[in-house]
């Protein structure tokens, strides 16, 4: 789903952007833009790290080379809280239709929100994740340089600290 383009059909129930399936993309039937701001390839790199099959140059493989991908090109020019929530709902719905579990990587480069899960967008996203089993959402960390947007915790010499903890009963980790 490209949330930025208008020359096509928006996915139901949304009223903006265009939706192209893999066959349309392979056949070159999806509209595109030459706008550098919309096509700077960050998503391509992230998708490669996540799911590259290793068939391209240098045979680099992603962490989940057999994964199916559902991609959304975000619209950052309008209400980001709406477009990110719509994107997450869209991806989970498509994965549900395919009968697949789903992990969403939200490396969108923004640091909006309350950072404590109390804002409405965070609550909506949490509700989408917990609506059914087999859903997870991860966010990029560390791209902010010296800006104060990092997860942090002061650890004393006498204190035990766990950054990641594996839930043995669920096969997942959290921090």
Predicted stretch roles:
Residues 1-82, 99, 132:
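Subtilisin-like serine protease catalytic core
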Residues 74-174:
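Substrate-binding/access-modulating region of protease and related hydrolase catalytic domains
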């Amino acid at each position: 789903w490209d949330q930025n383009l208008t020359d096509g059909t928006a996915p139901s129930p949304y009223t903006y952007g265009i939706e192209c399936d893999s066959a349309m993309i392979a056949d070159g039937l999806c509209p595109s833009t030459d706008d550098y701001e919309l096509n700077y390839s960050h998503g391509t790199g992230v998708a490669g790290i996540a799911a590259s099959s290793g068939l391209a140059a240098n045979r680099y493989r992603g962490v989940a080379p057999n994964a199916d991908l559902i991609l959304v090109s975000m619209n950052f020019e309008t209400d980001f809280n709406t477009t990110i929530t719509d994107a997450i709902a869209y991806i989970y719905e498509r994965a549900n239709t395919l009968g697949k579990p789903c992990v969403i990587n939200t490396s969108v480069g923004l640091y909006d929100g309350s950072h404590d899960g109390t804002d409405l967008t965070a609550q909506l996203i949490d509700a989408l994740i917990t609506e059914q089993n087999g859903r997870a959402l991860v966010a990029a960390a560390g791209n902010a340089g010296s800006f104060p947007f990092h997860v942090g915790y002061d650890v004393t010499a006498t204190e035990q600290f766990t950054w990641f903890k594996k839930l043995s009963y669920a096969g997942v980790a959290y921090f």
